[in-house]
Each structure stands twice: as C-alpha cells, then as structure tokens.
C-alpha cells in the first residue's frame, strides 16, 4: 500500500489531504472524534494517487457509499500545531483540496462510526446555519 502524503520537515510536518463536501437537506456531513471540533470527511492523499482518486476512496472508507465528484470547491492551506500524541506541539503545514460530491438522493452512510488508526470517529450531520467549532 502506498504511503500517505505526509512528510517530516525539520521540526514540522507537511500534510496533503482531501476533503469532501457532502450536503443533503440543508445539512453537511462532518466527522468528529473525542476532541471538541469537527472536520470534513476525507483524509490524506496516498503517494501515486490523484486528489480525485483520494477523495472518492476516503468517502467510501468513511461512509461506505461510492460517490462521484461534482467539482473542486476550493483549496485550503493552514499552519497549526498538532494535538494528537504523535504530533503534539509540532508545526503542521496542511494543504487540503476540498471537493463537492454528487450525493445520491437516497444517500445514508452505511455506518455512523469508523476507526481511523486507534481512534474512533463518528459522522455528524450539521445544519448549515449552526455555529460549530471546526478544524
């Protein structure tokens, strides 16, 4: 299996990921875990994989449903300090390619929770007018 697009740079990390905008009935599907913020369905691009292939794979892994891409929504870049144990206090530079997905009319995630490494994550529908902490 190919490695994630995650590169150690001096005392920091370069991370290249994809995110999916999955909207239905005025809500967007987000991911949560044991921390106090939510983030988009998605994950790291694997070396040798295109961003489009990565977002389709990540959506399938996290929702259990195969979806097509509608279009690239935007590119997001951010510097932040990691809070996971292996990345605590490391400066991370992250580039995210965020795609709008074509959501099937009868879409419902196969599972509401999944494992990402050793942490359990869960899917949350959030109203577009709701004020939430995001990552």
Q: Model regions: which residues?
A:
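A structural signal for short, well-ordered beta-strand segments
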Residues: 20, 72, 97-101
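NUDIX/MutT-family hydrolases
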Residues: 98-100, 110-135
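A generic structural micro-feature
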Residues: 12-14, 87-95, 115-120
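A short coil-to-beta-strand element that immediately follows conserved catalytic motifs
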Residues: 66-75
């Amino acid at each position: 299996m190919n490695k994630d697009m995650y590169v150690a740079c001096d005392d920091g990390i370069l991370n290249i990921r994809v995110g999916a905008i999955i909207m239905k009935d005025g809500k967007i599907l987000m991911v949560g875990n044991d921390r106090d913020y939510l983030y988009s369905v998605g994950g790291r691009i694997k070396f040798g994989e295109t961003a489009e292939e990565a977002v389709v794979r990540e959506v399938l892994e996290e929702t259990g449903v195969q979806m097509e891409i509608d279009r690239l929504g935007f590119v997001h870049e951010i510097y932040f300090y990691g809070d996971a144990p292996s990345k605590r206090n490391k400066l991370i530079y992250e580039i995210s390619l965020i795609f709008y997905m074509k959501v099937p009319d009868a879409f419902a995630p196969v599972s509401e929770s999944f494992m990402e490494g050793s942490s359990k994550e869960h899917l949350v529908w959030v109203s577009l007018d709701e004020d939430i902490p995001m990552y």
